[in-house]
Amino acid sequence: MVIPNLHNSIPICGKCDPKLTNSFIGIVLFLAVLIIGILILILFYYNKEINKNSSQYLPIHSPGSGNPSPSSSFLINNNNNNNNYHQNNNSNNNNIIYNPYYNSSTTSPYYLSPNSNHNPSLILYHQSRLLGNIHSINSINNNNNNNNNNPPTNISNKLNKNGETKNI
């Protein structure tokens, strides 16, 4: 006994129902798009976590404090020669400046000493554009304890003949 239209419901001799074929292809495509979407969401989540963890190296962050400190984020006066941010024992490293231009030749990827081959005034200038104020240039290269507490001065201030700042 022969069942009529059997080749329309199940594959026989390489033939199958076009409706079943289209449904199968649709299900496969839907699952593929779903899996790719989930993978993209996972990548975005991990990228966000990586960016959150790397935000401690932004220029407006004061190392070691845990909180942004715009007044002291780019210049750190340290009276001791053994600081944790710059491992260079060849010279006095009392002033540590954030290095916005990473150079593999420096001893630290994020901080550099003013007595390295970089220009600290140039780096300080770039920091002043971000923060709006600037420490006096004398406090960069001066290791005297009396000058470590100089307040930030405006970038338009100049020194007069007596060494005092005056506004222009």
From Swiss-Prot:
The chain crosses the membrane at residues 24-44. It is a single-pass membrane protein. One of its GO terms (cellular component) is membrane. Residues 69-92, 142-168 are annotated as: Disordered. Keywords: Membrane, Transmembrane, Transmembrane helix. Residues 142-157 have a biased composition (Low complexity). It is found in: Membrane. It comes from the Eukaryota. Its main location: membrane. This is Putative uncharacterized transmembrane protein DDB_G0288353. It comes from Dictyostelium discoideum (Social amoeba).
